[in-house]
Amino acid sequence: MILSSRLRLALIKLLAAMVVMVCAPAQAMADSPVEQRFAAIVIDAQTGETLYARHADARRYPASLTKVMTLYLAFDALDAGRVKSADPVVISRRAAARPPSRLGLRAGERLSMREAMDVLVVKSANDVATALAEHLAGNEAAFARAMTAKAKSLGLEHTRFLNASGLPQAGHFSTARDLALLGRAFLRDHPDDYTIFDQEQTVFRGRLIQGHNRLLSRPGIDGFKTGFVNASGYNLLTSGVRDGRRVIAVVLGGRSARSRDAFMAKLVQASFSSLAIRSAGFELTVADLMAQPAAPLSYASVASDEVASRPVIQAALTQAEPTTAQGDASPPSRLWVQVGAFRSKARGQARLADVVKRHPRRFGSGRGT
């Protein structure tokens, strides 16, 4: 695309006004606990290209991001006909004894496969993760071996699973890059089922369960999972789509859920901006558009590890999302709502009917039922 010099200059000024680099503190913090746990990556979901990376190949505790693989294998089993969504999953004594977060069912109680999977996403219930693993593989250790084998087959070379929940266990690890690749594999292999991650809440036997993923209320962001254990810090795997371009992002080791979410929102926004720059025919890094650095975030360093000739995300927007004008009580425009992409029309219609119930804040329907 050929642009006049005036138009190019105007576009550069516009982008410079929108984008601000998140700079690292002047003092190196390589030995700090924060830096030892922090890792992040953004990839283009279509091409697999790395847009941003920081400590992306360093071993980290995945915490409840582990449950994305648990659900991947559950959907594999459903697709193969080995189990059905209505099949009962029994809570064993071992499952009932798992530490929080948990649903709290007693040993011997049951829930359906579909209920278990929904609760696994929204509640991040460790007791349900163990019960689901036992239902699918006989015991959790066997299921964990299947998880690791699947990881290797998907190209996750630096991942080892020892349980289905992500509770801390020596030798249970992954990397930011591997978790992003897992997200990409889920989108590719289970596209109709990805919408399970786009739930702000669920109802289990009349009990409303609120989720932990606050980014789901943001336009364009449509799924995946939060995670936390003391050893890992606050983790998040997310994905979003804008103008037909989807990115997958992972942030590990946040100091708090709030700082993790703020960093992720800015990182995703910056990724979309970088892709827009490319589509306009520019070979500019976000740093080229910067005038003044922003105040540091709660991470020791966010400079990119990747060196390439094409633009690499090295920044985040000052404001992750535009705010609604004060006094405007109307809900956001429905134009931005993406229900999903489905191979089956019937599944798409079923999902559409379920959206309002799962996202009451988006549709102004209160607590929902």
Give the location of each predicted region:
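N-terminal secretory signal peptides that target proteins for export/translocation
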Residues: 1-9
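Local beta-strand/beta-hairpin segments that build beta-sheet-rich folds
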Residues: 51, 289, 339-340
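Short structural boundary motif marking the start of a folded domain
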Residues: 38, 333-336
